Curated annotation (Swiss-Prot):
This is Orotate phosphoribosyltransferase. It is an enzyme of class 2 (transferase). The gene is pyrE. Belongs to the purine/pyrimidine phosphoribosyltransferase family. PyrE subfamily. InterPro entries: OPRT, Orotate_PRibTrfase_bac, PRibTrfase_dom, PRTase-like. It comes from Thermoanaerobacter pseudethanolicus (strain ATCC 33223 / 39E) (Clostridium thermohydrosulfuricum).
Length: 190
């Protein structure tokens, strides 16, 4: 799938939002990517998940896991594409855990997925969880990589599209300095 095609779908679905946003990473940005808009349409969920699954073709994958909330539907749909088990990790008292009877068995090959990667914080938490359970993380996949190539997961990282979007620390944010109201659209509680 070409970048222009992805951007056309994003535009059609209203994925790209402009304003002053507090990202899940804690950074500020003038752009927020609301990938949940993709997942409200099974057709587009399947398209993007299939694209991501193809990037890991040839890998033996037993489990696909994503962090709640952004990775839940993506993990399910990618798992469906590759014939694997789908799980999601969620925070309990600030720590990523498997709940609801989910388990990763020792030695299982695990693909970690997330809708958007900026700093990779949530993904790294899931990787640490999988490693603590003696799973074998074979890679990380996302629909959007907005890290500008700065994230290193120490396993292959592949995305459907890379979009560089400027992010700022709170103290350096020009939008804060202009007095533009801050919006927190993400799912993580601070």
């Amino acid at each position: 799938m070409e970048k222009e095609e992805v951007l056309e779908i994003f535009s059609k679905l209203g994925v790209i939002n402009k304003g002053h946003f507090l990202l899940t990473s804690g950074k500020h940005s003038d752009t927020y990517l609301q990938c949940a808009k993709i997942f409200q349409y099974p057709k587009y969920s399947e398209i993007f998940s299939k694209e991501l699954a193809l990037k890991f073709k040839g890998h033996e994958i037993d489990v696909v896991i994503g962090p709640a909330i952004g990775g839940i539907i993506l993990a399910y749909e990618v798992a469906r594409q590759v014939g694997a088990k789908a799980l999601f990790a969620e925070r309990e008292e600030g720590v990523m855990k498997l709940r609801r009877g989910f388990e990763i068995k020792e030695g299982e090959n695990v693909l970690v997925v997330e809708d958007v990667v900026t700093t990779g914080g949530s993904v790294k938490e899931v990787i640490n969880l999988v490693n603590s359970l003696k799973g074998n993380v074979i890679g990380v996949g996302s629909i959007v990589d907005r890290s500008d190539g700065k994230v290193n997961f120490e396993v292959p990282f592949k995305s459907v599209v890379s979009l560089y979007v400027e992010t700022y620390e709170k103290e350096e944010c020009p939008l804060c300095k202009e007095g533009i109201p801050l919006v927190k659209p993400g799912s993580r509680k601070f």
